[in-house]
Amino acid sequence: MPPKPKITRDMIIDAAIKVIRKTGYESINARTVSGELHCSTQPVMYHFSTIDSLKQAAYAQTDQMHTEYLMDIPPDRDPVLGIGLNYIRFAVEEPQLFRFLFQSGYAQESSLLEMIDSEELIPVLAAMQDGTGMSMEKTRQVFLTVALFAHGYASIIANNGLEYDEKLVAGHLEHAWNGAILAAVQEENEHEETV
């Protein structure tokens, strides 16, 4: 029976994420990851036949971390506004991981519209629909508006184009949320009047 590897697949993925946090996803290679682990490149190449497969594994784990971060909402906060603020705060606290998730081309979904149709979002959309009383189509429309707004803010902050001010961001996010709901309700009312 061969000896059990001392450097595991999970250790390598964790090391890759540490490298990304420090210097960005572009710097992931067998040397940088093995340097983080203080080992030769052999364990990295043993567990991952290509660096791209390592990046994909690191992406999946980072995506899971991001989802958990987003869903950690205080009980007294509106869920959608909480998710939006957490999305932006993640870009503030983890700018390199944010860039890896949303600006590297490793996303499984090829567009934001595909993300909105993903199964993982159904509970969030259902909660929004219950809270607003709108159709699922209008709920998706409102979510897309708020998501685009939050993503824009987060991208600007992650790329050092703006200082983070939570009070200001929360106010803008709430205005976007309320405006999107108001526009969706107005559209529904106008549609009902024409029918």
PLM feature segments, named:
Residues F100-Q103, A147-D165, G179-E190:
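Amphipathic C-terminal alpha-helical segment
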Residues Q108-M134, R140-L144, G171-L182:
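Amphipathic alpha-helical packing segments from all-alpha helical-bundle domains
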Residues M71-L97, F143-V146:
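Hydrophobic alpha-helical connector segments
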Residues I7, M11-K18, K22, S53-D72, ...:
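Alpha-helical structural segments
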Residues M11, A15, V19-S53, A57:
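Helix-turn-helix
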Residues N29, R99-L101, S110, D165-E166, ...:
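Short, hydrophobic secondary-structure boundary micro-motifs
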Residues M1-I7, E188-V195:
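N-terminal intrinsically disordered/low-complexity leader segments
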